[in-house]
């Protein structure tokens, strides 16, 4: 008989997984984020992991980053799954969802969505092929008030401040500022410039200047003006004055500066430096039309954005004949969490949910031990019974290794009292499973 082939398990690059101890911290983070979103009245939504490819490609995402779905043993003429792909973000699926369920929703519709997404990127530090995003969006019929553009950064500030993460800054810009400035310079394809400027922090000013001149067709003076705009940064409305000094005028530019100033005013009560207007922030996706956000770690801005989003005027327009503008922002949970794990800032917490371990002195006592466990569970204590009869010391060691705080000793002889031991203090006392309070 031939030996069974052993498949050596190896990690898959770009697909992170955690030990139970680390995962317990991630779950607490997820619960904290969920509660933060719900405090502001956002409702939970979940969409399928897959969408029709036409939906995923409807807003300009590159097809190279989309994982398609097909059965391994699919027939050559079976195309039923050929047009399905894993979603690369949660915004486009959300737009499809709103259009599909339009008559069942109350507007403005405030939703949060915490799910995994997939992108066919080259794995590297801070970039994964499977990761968790935590999104909030507000979408409305015909018009969405600008104050929502300020509410979302406020929510993110509260949520991230409640997590033990390194200092970070949320940078804000407005696509109308960029588009109006570029059009005021006589640039005919502002989107091409926006995509180039979006790479500024990754490839540097010289490389962006080269793209602007060689690929976007700008003159040297136009490219210089675009880069000069991108250097403007400030935590208050003085950025508006700085743009005015560049001497470019356009109605769209004026509208964008007005919106940017209003959002900054509404966020002026947040701690100094936590929200900054940064006119280099562009966000390369085509569907953003107004306010855009991008947050980075202060001590490692090159790590990439940990939170991003923006305003869109008609994201659902290809799915329904209604105007449905919205604004959204997404927290990159996996990117933040993985950095802290790799740096040793997260070493894990109490990973086992068990509150009480009921020892099993003998197989004959299993029924009695199970009855004790049932009583404790009814009273709200997560309880497990040791899996087999064994020496008491071995069972206690099991509890210690799993961070179980209490060990319960049923009567070894009929008529004797129950006892419970607190492993943190070493105290062991008599207790009644029907009334014990922990």
From Swiss-Prot:
It catalyses: tRNA(His) + L-histidine + ATP = L-histidyl-tRNA(His) + AMP + diphosphate + H(+). The keyword Protein biosynthesis applies. GO terms for molecular function: ATP binding; histidine-tRNA ligase activity. Pfam families: HGTP_anticodon, tRNA-synt_His. Its EC number is 6.1.1.21. The keyword Nucleotide-binding applies. It is found in: Cytoplasm. It comes from the Bacteria. PROSITE patterns: AA_TRNA_LIGASE_II (PS50862). GO terms for cellular component: cytoplasm. SUPFAM superfamilies: Class II aaRS ABD-related, Class II aaRS and biotin synthetases. Keywords: Aminoacyl-tRNA synthetase, ATP-binding, Cytoplasm, Ligase, Nucleotide-binding, Protein biosynthesis. One of its GO terms (biological process) is histidyl-tRNA aminoacylation. CDD domains: HisRS-like_core (cd00773). Belongs to the class-II aminoacyl-tRNA synthetase family. Homodimer. This is Histidine--tRNA ligase. It comes from Thermobifida fusca (strain YX). The lineage of its organism: Bacteria, Bacillati, Actinomycetota, Actinomycetes, Streptosporangiales. The gene is hisS.
């Amino acid at each position: 008989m031939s030996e069974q082939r052993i498949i050596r398990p190896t990690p898959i690059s770009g697909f992170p997984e955690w030990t139970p101890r680390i995962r317990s911290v991630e779950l607490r983070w997820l619960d904290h984020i969920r509660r933060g979103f719900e405090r502001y009245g956002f409702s939970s939504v979940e969409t399928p992991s897959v969408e029709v490819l036409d939906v995923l490609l409807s807003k300009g995402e590159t097809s190279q980053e989309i994982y398609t779905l097909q059965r391994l043993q699919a027939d050559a003429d079976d195309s039923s799954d050929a047009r399905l792909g894993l979603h690369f973000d949660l915004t486009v699926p959300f737009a499809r969802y709103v259009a599909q369920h339009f008559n069942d929703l109350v507007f403005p519709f405030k939703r949060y969505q915490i799910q995994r997404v997939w992108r066919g990127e080259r794995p590297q530090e801070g970039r994964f092929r499977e990761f968790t995003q935590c999104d909030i969006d507000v979408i409305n019929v015909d018009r969405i008030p600008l104050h929502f553009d300020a509410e979302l950064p406020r929510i993110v500030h509260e949520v991230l401040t409640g997590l033990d993460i390194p200092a970070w800054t949320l940078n804000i810009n407005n696509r109308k500022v960029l588009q109006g400035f570029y059009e005021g310079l006589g640039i005919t394809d502002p989107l091409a410039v926006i995509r180039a400027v979006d790479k500024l922090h990754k490839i540097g000013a010289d490389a962006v200047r080269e793209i602007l001149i060689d690929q976007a067709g700008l003159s040297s003076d136009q490219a210089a003006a675009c880069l000069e705009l991108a250097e403007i940064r400030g935590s208050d409305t003085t950025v508006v004055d700085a743009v005015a000094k560049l001497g470019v005028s356009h109605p769209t530019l004026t509208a964008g500066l007005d919106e940017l100033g209003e959002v900054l005013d509404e966020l002026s009560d947040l701690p100094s430096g936590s929200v900054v207007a940064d006119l280099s922030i562009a966000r390369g996706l085509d569907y953003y039309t107004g306010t855009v956000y991008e947050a980075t770690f202060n001590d490692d801005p090159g790590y990439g954005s940990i939170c991003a989003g923006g305003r869109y005027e008609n994201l659902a327009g290809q799915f329904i004949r209604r105007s449905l503008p919205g604004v959204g922002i997404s927290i990159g949970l996996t990117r933040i969490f993985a950095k802290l794990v790799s740096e040793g800032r997260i070493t894990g917490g109490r990973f086992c949910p068990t509150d009480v371990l009921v020892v099993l002195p003998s197989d004959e006592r299993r029924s009695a031990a199970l009855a004790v466990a049932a009583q404790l569970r009814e009273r709200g204590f997560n309880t497990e019974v040791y899996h087999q009869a064994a020496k008491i010391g071995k069972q206690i060691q099991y509890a210690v290794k799993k961070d179980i705080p209490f060990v319960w000793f049923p009567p070894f002889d009929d008529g004797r009292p129950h006892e419970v031991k607190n492993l943190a203090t070493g105290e062991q006392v008599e207790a009644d499973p029907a009334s014990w309070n922990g």
